């Protein structure tokens, strides 16, 4: 314990990090949500007071919150009770708000916002639409992070990063981007693809996995023999890694291209390396976490074909062993540059700006970046479209038999009160695995299908740095850590748009992105995801902070 305490002091764990989670009016927003979560089943009559509207506070601004975001406390407790079958035991009767809409959309992420957008196109501008969202902010996976370092505003994505391969989008999806004012060709101007040209990828070998702590710069840039000479790896592992990257042998000789693809689809990448490439077990830890950034599991749980067909978007590593197979290059992909400074949060914000005039100022894809959303305008009485945050839907059902009903009733919890609204239609654009619990009329077969998937547990951490001089001095822009708590740490995407200027000089503040996937190697893939999600839910913020500082 003394050693742990000394290490914490060395890491600065006792030094205060400013967290705006509980300040001024924001305390009402976040703290109130947490407090009400303890008794989310209280009916309006039992609660005996009006539902609070923390969003009306001038200080309510979720993008500026720090600490644990994503599925933050207050966003999931009601849903967990619904899942566990305990919610309705004490829920009582919902209070009818008296509201009636043409459409209620469950979920305020990009899919829910887009559903409202398309419905309004079809039904007309006078259509009355209510969007219910359980989180304290809209966007779903497309959230926005804001940091202030002195007077400098830094932006980063709070989830989904980029418009990935837009050339493959459907006509409808491409049309939506165009209608929102997103001009894809502008990203070639805004994304500074040369800023990091002089900075290389580094690999951090940790003592727990490799026997000593060592950072080696030049991964993928130096000749492999020169790079590996500095690595704390057994000589056999070094020889195997160098060989599999450089000899370009056909490890599946005798098979046709179709047979090779079939075989690669049947085996994991770990099996491909060990069985066909004859890579020793000592070398496998170097490759173990390569698939984390896309698949959230290691090389033992991802097919070799998936690795071949999905090269790393960050160009932090390259999968070895495929160059000599004669399968050509993976299908052409668009460059990974279609990135707003706040990631795809700008798409969600453009949708909200279109749906709710006055909520976010401006008119273009450039001015959306620095525009401040007015959360008090999202749920205005009398507005055609209303977006209601901090509202967890617990039931959606027809009023009457499904084949004859003219209305849908949607029950939700907000501020500790159970409420209901009515609508002519309802779209469930929420977390798919919750739909069987909140829509009892679904056929059992469809419920089973919705239960099948398991979400990948990604932990995206964004850290505001006072400057990035240490990275410039080391000559690196990203660090791969095969055995580390975070498998990747990299400087943010270099995008300047409108009035937002990316920090180009090492003396300027910078956002550092860190990736962790809490998977459990050895278990089946879905079991790893479930175990990882449990770990994530049980991990205190101090653990993340300690490993960020380490």
Predicted regions and their residues:
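N-terminal secretory signal peptides
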Residues: 1-17, 21, 45
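N-terminal export signals
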Residues: 15, 21-43
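N-terminal Rossmann-like FAD-binding beta1-loop-alpha1 element of flavoenzymes
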Residues: 102-130
